[in-house]
Amino acid sequence: MTTVVIMPGGFHPFHAGHLALYHSAQRAFPDAEVYVAATNDTAARPFPFVVKEKLAKLAGVEAGHFVQVKSPFRAEEITAQFDPQRDHLIFVRSDKDKNQPPMPGIIKKDGNPSYLQPLLGAKKIEPFSKHAYMAYLPTVEFGPGLTSATQIRTAWPTLNSKRKTALVMSLYPRTQGNEKLAQSVIKLLDAAIGTQDVAETMSISQTTANTSGAGAGMSASYQRRDNQPVDEDYLSEHRL
């Protein structure tokens, strides 16, 4: 019997908060197979799967664990590898998404419980042929006032080059001390999110207006953490 844990999401872009949730899932379910499920859908948001995958790899997701799927909350591309009659399936989300669909524990019109059930309080865990389960893990602040990719997308076009570098080094610690790699990430984000000219002298209050403090008080100097060798050119070849 295997427990499969899937972290579904949009990941526009994948960032340090997502990585923290991924690691939280690994700690919460130490014997499970933990995956991240993402689509290639850019109809409403800007990041294609190939860029999401590069940023997830840079952040620290292991190879083979960031998987392209058609539907993140079905993730059949992942579950097809496992036995629906024996194995258990758990989806994990951040606490901040507790009120976002899909909601676990809904009673269907015919009076039967829905396929997706809350893990908390479950007396018996059924194989995923019958039910999947939802677990919520603590939300992690991954930058000054940042808890979501939406805040990154909102803040990014308002930041000057210095603050973009600072934010990238906060979101992706492996870029710290590697200016070329940081600039490659900035080019990816500029291409996906967009950019505008911002004066270097813009005040912090102007830069962070309506962005929940994104980039406020940040500098490009950080205590380096989790600095792993990364090919500085591996992000440079990409198509958007």
Locations of regions flagged by a protein language model:
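Short acidic (Asp/Glu) patches
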Residues: A209
